[in-house]
Regions:
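Extreme N-terminal tail/first-helix region
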Residues: 1-23, 143, 149-152
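Charged, amphipathic alpha-helical segments
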Residues: 13-16, 56-57, 61
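Extracytoplasmic/cell-surface-exposed regions of Actinobacterial cell-envelope-associated
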Residues: 16, 22, 97, 119, ...
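Short gly/pro-enriched beta-turn/loop segments at secondary-structure junctions
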Residues: 23-26, 41, 117-119, 126
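Short beta-strand segments
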Residues: 25-58, 74
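A short local loop/turn or secondary-structure capping micro-motif enriched for an aromatic residue
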Residues: 49-51, 62-65, 140-142
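Short, structured beta-strand-loop surface elements
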Residues: 59-128
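Charged phosphate-binding loop/patch that engages nucleotide di/tri-phosphates or the phosphate backbone
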Residues: 122-152
Length: 152
């Protein structure tokens, strides 16, 4: 995919800043393609661990998508003052199953927000990108007639 032309006022974030924003975000969106080829989005709380995103889950849609090996994405965003930002991690996910890696996750304080058994750990690795931009007032989007006969 080719890079889009720069947009005035949009700051492309460096990798360090992207990881810091991922660390600070209380939750993110895990994006997968299900078995029927449809996109699905799951809000999850997470932790940054060893250059990856880690979250807990139970058996079900997220774990099935991970097992399929399809590409995934993980997205966080926010607003700070008059600046908005977005960070996306695009890559692959795997269920943490090796004993050494499972023991290592014990040091990551990651308690699921939703009740129920969330005994599975998923790790997402990939390419990171992010951007920050000024929040535009709603008046910018006001659209009037473009000329005679144009819809209002």
């Amino acid at each position: 995919m080719s890079a889009a032309a720069p947009v005035p006022g949009v700051e492309v974030l460096d990798e360090r800043t992207c990881w810091e924003l991922l660390r600070q975000a209380p939750y993110g969106r895990f994006v997968v393609v299900d078995a029927d080829g449809r996109p699905d989005v799951f809000p999850v709380n997470h932790a940054v661990d060893h250059g990856s995103v880690l979250f807990r889950t139970a058996d079900g849609g997220k774990l099935a998508a991970v097992a399929s090996g399809s590409p995934v994405a993980f997205e966080v965003d926010g607003v700070s003052g008059d600046l908005a930002w977005s960070v996306v991690l695009r890559g692959v996910a795997h269920q943490v199953t090796r004993m050494a890696e499972l023991l290592d996750t014990a040091s990551v304080h990651l308690a699921p927000w939703q009740a129920g058994g969330k005994g599975r750990f998923v790790r997402v690795r990939g390419d990171l990108s992010g951007r920050r931009f000024p929040v535009t007032g709603s008046g910018w989007w006001a659209v009037g007639p473009a000329g005679p006969g144009a819809p209002a």
